[in-house]
Amino acid sequence: MEPAEKVKHFPDKPGVYLFRGARGEVLYVGKAVSLKNRVRSYFTGARSDKVQALVGKTRDVECLVTGSEIEALILESNLIKEHRPRYNVVLKDDKSYPYLKVTVQEEYPRIFLTRAQPRDGARYFGPYPSAAAVHETVRLLKKLFPLRSCRQTRFRQQRPCLNHHIGRCLGPCSGTVDPERYRAMVQEVLLFLEGRHADLVRGLARKMEAAAANLEFERAAELRDQLRAVEQVLARQSIVSPGREDRDVLALARDGNRGRVIVLEIRDGKLLGRHSLDLQGIAERSDAEVLAAFLKQYYREAGLIPPEVLLPVPLGEEQGLIAEWLGLRRQGRVRLHVPRRGRKRELVRLAEQNAAEARAQMEFERDAGEALAELAAVLGLDQAPARLEGYDISNLQGAQTVGVMVVFEDGRPAPGEYRQFRVRETAGTPNDFAAMREVVARRFARAREEGKLIATGRLSSRDARFHRLPDLVLVDGGKGQLSAALEGLRETGFEAVPVFALTKEEEKIFAPGRSDPVPVPPGSQALFLLQHLRDEAHRFAVDTHRRTRSRESLRSLLEEIDGIGPARRRALQKAFPSLDALKGATLAELAAVPSMNRKAAQAVYDYFQDTPTE
């Protein structure tokens, strides 16, 4: 039966409808108060280009009746998440957004990043816009609250870890920690994450005063230091509301079919966080439709829902329904409000300013796409390169030669993909060509090895560090560096990878098999992108070489100390990677390093106390 004919038999009841394509794939999911009337409207009367395209690809349509409109909204949200239909407004890659997990169901809870939310009794906070944002939050929390980092499930009496000795963990592994005290600290972490900062500060102050009254002066001092640290962090947060309200403030940036929603999280009257989340499929949709779709997807997964959400535009007929659904999820009233004046309107303007910046960023990303397309045309590539790798060598008269690899993905630096290499074959001899050949060969040899391990199931692609191959390799230099890189690729069987060189002075691009530079039009975006990649590789190489020299200097100093052999040197350098960190270490921190004892720690401590600071 044709879809238009099938719709005539739909019930006049609330529910959800699905449009399916030729392969049975879900093209669109929607909800309706009356399934018959809503779906029939797609096949009659005037239609937008997008609806016309949807109907043209539709080979079947089905409906699911629900008991109420609110049930339809919930089902619609679940189906959009499951199928990610092409014609719906969807959060871009919403499955990959990270969350912060607090394992409150464990005897001694932990905090860490996760991308899954099983019903395991844990508390989840997010979604966050990136893993880096979660890691930064975890780092801050562990600085304020000494939670454990280990994955142990049984806590028997054993020697505490280094984190315990340096005050970064209470040490439940030792079996000496009061579970109630640890639990109380976890509650303080939850207060911090929920934005209940005034309650947190008051609670810490009360505990400090109680400890002092009970003559527990050491405990009182610990609480005093913790209270000061919390207050210092909170002092850096902007007060954006004179009251102590909790609310989210939303604004929308648009660029063609893409959108970006800014979410300002205000907790206890302070700006706690700013999230930027991407949407796709927004062309020919009003701001109200886009924001309504966003609310249903974002708050479906959100760990916390505030009592008020400020919007830049009203959502129309869906506003009341979405507010009701949010109230059910929060288990308390939620107000969706479009302020026209006053302080709340100023908050929306602040979010809109952030949205304007997001719009500029989206335009940059579009420009980067154009630059990559131009790069493919200029260099004769089959398609625009998504992953670019830049290589450079740095040394000081041949000493401590290092090589680096930097990565651009979709035209932007991806620092998490950067890699460093200590050159082995030409150690002590200044030979940049040989060093370049070695670095490129080692990088692609690792890719080959990891590919085999992944294929046999002995390594997951998530844990691999070199298996992703570039669409283009760029080396800093001229024909000599290009030949060296090409040799490294041939050695490892990757000669098919496109490789080019870019000189510094004349800004000329050289390609294998041609003696003259590749012609590039003046003001070329492609050339600008390659220059950016080359300069970033050079910067990273210089920084890496500087850090290497610093480590070597530290190793040389440790060699002068009696009782500090190779094993202890390695352990000390792992625990204290810089000279300043080692000089600032206390005797207890030094003694807590694996393989160290009190006598060796005293020797290191005395040596650096007598060494003048430069």
Swiss-Prot record:
The keyword DNA repair applies. The keyword Cytoplasm applies. Residues 198-233 form the UVR domain. Keywords: Cytoplasm, DNA damage, DNA excision, DNA repair, Excision nuclease, SOS response. It comes from Desulforudis audaxviator (strain MP104C). GO terms for molecular function: DNA binding; excinuclease ABC activity. NCBIfam families: PRK00558.1-5 (NF001824), uvrC (TIGR00194). This is UvrABC system protein C. Residues 12-89 form the GIY-YIG domain. GO terms for biological process: nucleotide-excision repair; SOS response. Its main location: cytoplasm. It is found in: Cytoplasm. GO terms for cellular component: cytoplasm; excinuclease repair complex. Interacts with UvrB in an incision complex. Transmembrane segments: none annotated. SMART domains: GIYc (SM00465). Belongs to the UvrC family. The UvrABC repair system catalyzes the recognition and processing of DNA lesions. UvrC both incises the 5' and 3' sides of the lesion. The N-terminal half is responsible for the 3' incision and the C-terminal half is responsible for the 5' incision.
